[in-house]
From Swiss-Prot:
Domain PpiC: 173-274, 283-383
Annotated NCBIfam families: PRK10770.1
EC number, UniProt record: 5.2.1.8
UniProt protein name: Chaperone SurA
Primary site of residence: periplasm
Organism: Shewanella oneidensis (strain ATCC 700550 / JCM 31522 / CIP 106686 / LMG 19005 / NCIMB 14063 / MR-1)
Length: 434
């Protein structure tokens, strides 16, 4: 998951409607038990309504209600498992960090927070619900980063090999938008089960070749991680996409359908939805310095922010120097001894909130205090430059591509492991009980 790509407003189009008359309403019920947590029927209904509303707005067709319900329940199960893991390790996105994220989103949308609130209200969405949905999305991104990142290793040999390939391609690569359908098989399947899954996959393939809508088919038939999005994996180049895709799309063009491809997970059908060329570009680097204070049982969130506000006053009045305060107070061991200096770097190497803050500053400007996952910061943008650091760019790019590919693969492995270890029971709706 890329934390810097914050949710746009459409993702918060929660389809929550209230009855206009006080008619008797059925009692809510427990629809799914997940370990010691539950999913209510109303949550499933709300998400189904959201998917339908978004599909209608995008003029997309949908499968049967039962197929859609299955996909929604699976999404809610995986979401709840991740949130339970976040609770277990004490991961919590506080109000101050949430406010900072909202300010960043408003800035990206080129509006104030008040204007953003008005826009959200005009779409019939409660701002408090927007906040809580954003808090959940940030939590999911953080728990995925914490749990999956430590499972990934990128070797120097992998980087060297990919750098060579990038150099040979002259950075003129292609990005693909991939459609993916997975027809799964049970664990330790019998030959009859394998044959049944194979027949299902071939039937799906024939329907697609006959012109059936891919997105609708994926929602109805796929067990893959992107099923609820119509099976669509957004633009990736061959070096960052899951290995399975990379191995089969070489030479493929837009519109090609590939498969079924058998793996241990089942039978895969892949369609090239779109392809676009990549272009080389100059690298913009920034030289910055910062002061970091980490909230703790001794140092509260409010106190950390207040201290940085006081530092700002001292720096602006000439009472103190940035570098001296950084050496004395900053809790970033890598930069404190250097007066807070971070050196030249691309902004994208930093956590999203830090990168966004740097991008908003002019040279010599010092930010207001802001929160990241590391703690509270103030940062000064000292210089910007554009450079033709091709070798370093290729190395960084290679590492990023390999990491993203492995992250996507390990994320799915982690989710599968959590699901396999969890107690999950799906209760049938009243209308289906005999």
């Amino acid at each position: 998951m890329k934390p810097s790509k914050h949710l746009i407003f459409a993702l918060f189009a929660l389809a929550i409607s209230q009855p206009t008359m006080a008619a008797p309403q059925p009692l809510d019920r427990v629809a799914v038990q997940i370990n010691d947590g539950i999913v209510l029927e109303s949550e499933i209904t709300n998400m189904i309504d959201t998917v339908k509303a978004n599909a209608k707005a995008a003029n997309q067709s949908l499968p049967s209600d039962s197929a859609l319900r299955t996909q929604v329940i699976e999404r809610l199960i995986l979401t709840r498992l991740q949130l339970q893991m976040a609770d277990r390790i004490g991961l919590h996105i506080g109000d101050l960090q949430l406010d900072q994220a909202i300010e960043n989103i408003a800035r990206e949308q080129k509006m104030t927070v008040a204007q953003m609130q008005q826009k959200i209200a005009s779409e019939g969405i409660s701002f408090s619900q927007y906040r809580e949905q954003l808090r959940e999305e940030i939590t999911l991104g953080e728990i995925q980063r914490i749990q999956v990142q430590r499972r990934i290793q990128v070797s120097p040999q992998e980087i060297t090999g990919l750098v060579k390939l990038i150099q040979e391609q002259g950075m003129k690569d292609v990005e693909y938008q991939i459609g993916h359908i997975l027809i799964d098989v049970p664990n330790n399947p019998t030959s009859e089960q394998l044959e049944a899954s194979s027949k299902r996959a071939n039937a799906v393939l024939e329907r697609l070749k006959s012109g059936e809508d891919f997105r609708r088919t994926a929602i109805a038939s796929s067990s893959g991680p992107k099923a609820l999005e119509g099976g669509i994996w957004d633009y990736m180049n061959i070096n960052e996409m899951p290995t399975l895709f990379a191995e089969v799309i070489n030479g493929a063009k837009k519109g090609d359908i590939i498969g079924p491809i058998k793996t241990g997970a089942g039978f895969h059908i892949i369609k090239i939805m779109d392809a676009r060329g990549l272009q080389t570009k100059e690298i913009e680097e920034v030289r910055a310095r910062h002061i970091l204070l980490k909230p703790s049982p001794i140092l509260s969130e409010d106190r950390a922010k207040a201290m940085l506000e006081q530092f700002l006053k001292q720096i602006r009045s000439g009472e103190a120097k940035f570098e001296d305060l950084a050496r004395q107070y900053s809790e970033d061991p890598g930069s404190a001894t250097k007066g807070g200096e971070l050196g030249w770097a691309e902004p994208s190497i930093y956590v999203p909130e830090f990168a966004q803050t740097l991008n908003s500053l002019s040279p010599d400007q010092i930010s207001e205090p802001f929160r990241t996952t590391h703690g509270w910061h103030i940062t000064q943008l000292e210089e910007r430059r554009k450079t033709d650091a091709t070798d370093q760019f290729n190395t960084n790019r290679a590492h990023q591509l390999i990491f993203r590919r492995k992250f996507n693969e390990e994320l799915q492995n982690w989710l599968d492991e959590m699901r396999a270890d969890a107690y999950i029971e799906v209760f049938q709706p009243e209308s289906n009980r005999g």
